[in-house]
Design a protein with these regions (language model features):
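Transmembrane-helix signature of polytopic, membrane-embedded enzymes
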Residues: 25-57
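Specific aromatic-rich, kink-prone transmembrane helix
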Residues: 29, 70-87, 119-131
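Short hydrophobic alpha-helices at membrane interfaces in multi-pass membrane enzymes
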Residues: 84-102, 149-153, 225-232
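Membrane-interface alpha helices of multi-pass inner-membrane proteins
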Residues: 55-59, 93-113, 157-161, 231-238
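Short hydrophobic/aromatic helix or loop-helix immediately within or flanking a transmembrane segment
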Residues: 1-11
């Protein structure tokens, strides 16, 4: 509804230009979080050629006047805010997440459930950190009561924010109803799972993902459990439907790519 209204006011040409601007903003946010703009912190050439360039090329090719690419900005914003909250203990920006969620659910309600997925996963990993310290290279930060309180409040607010829309509570179940629509799943190709037998899918989508996973395996650094859990959330979603590829690219670049560059991830240096 919002997109139709904007098209009627501005015309499709300006909406397409706006979506391309959103693409550039999201790429900037991703690359900044990955550390690409840091002095003397350049990614390995192979990572550029085999991961970042193919992924952002596919993302750019998908950039048209669709609400999914507004949602991409929201996913990037959640990555930036949650990463800084977890690694740098910056709590106050987390209270922007419910506000972002209100915009998200009213612009593209079909993906707004990602808001409470992301916050909920960070909350669960934080609780797990009370009982678990490290599992190999996977690091669980031991939370204090203040952090648990903040993340729980933000989670409740984000869930509540999903109710602020013309359809109320029904928007909480709408995405799941979509996923059960057999006709839509059969006739809309982007809802299908990625097909590794397709050469382009293999080279441009699956191979960069596998290299992202290899990044985690090869790094000598401790890997934050929350960042890893968010990455695997989007892997599962992508394997369920190719429509989540754009969001996987964003999450992989923001949260996992820094490990490929051997960038210091300690507090105050993100």
């Amino acid at each position: 509804g919002v997109l139709i209204y904007l098209v009627s006011c501005m015309g499709m040409r300006w909406i397409v230009i706006g979506c391309h601007l959103l693409y550039l903003i999201v790429v900037y946010l991703c690359c900044k979080q990955a550390g690409l703009f840091r002095k003397n912190q350049n990614p390995p050439a192979l990572y550029w050629m085999l991961v970042l360039l193919p992924q952002f090329a596919v993302y750019a090719n998908m950039t048209v006047a669709r609400p999914q690419y507004v949602s991409a900005l929201f996913v990037a914003a959640f990555c930036v805010i949650l990463r800084n909250a977890v690694l740098n203990k910056k709590y106050k920006p987390m209270y922007l997440l419910p506000i972002i969620t209100v915009l998200w659910v009213n612009i593209h309600g079909g993906t707004a459930m990602l808001s409470y997925y992301m916050v909920g996963i960070v909350m669960l990993i934080s609780v797990a950190g009370i009982f678990v310290k490290n599992i190999g290279k996977i690091s669980f930060d031991k939370p204090d009561g203040q952090w648990i309180g903040h993340i729980f409040i933000v989670f409740v607010l984000v869930v509540a924010a999903n109710l602020i829309n013309p359809y109320g509570w029904h928007m909480l179940i709408y995405p799941y109803e979509n996923m059960q629509d057999s006709m839509m799943l059969a006739y809309i190709s982007e809802w299908a799972s990625p097909d590794a037998k397709n050469v382009l899918t293999l080279v441009l989508e699956i191979l960069p993902l596998l290299l992202g996973i290899f990044t985690i395996v090869q790094t000598d650094k401790q890997i934050n459990a929350s960042m890893l859990a968010l990455f695997f959330l989007y892997i599962v979603l992508f394997l369920r439907s190719e429509r989540f590829l754009t969001y996987l690219v964003i999450v992989q670049t923001c949260l996992i790519a820094p490990y490929a560059f051997q960038i210091e991830l300690s507090p105050g240096k993100s």
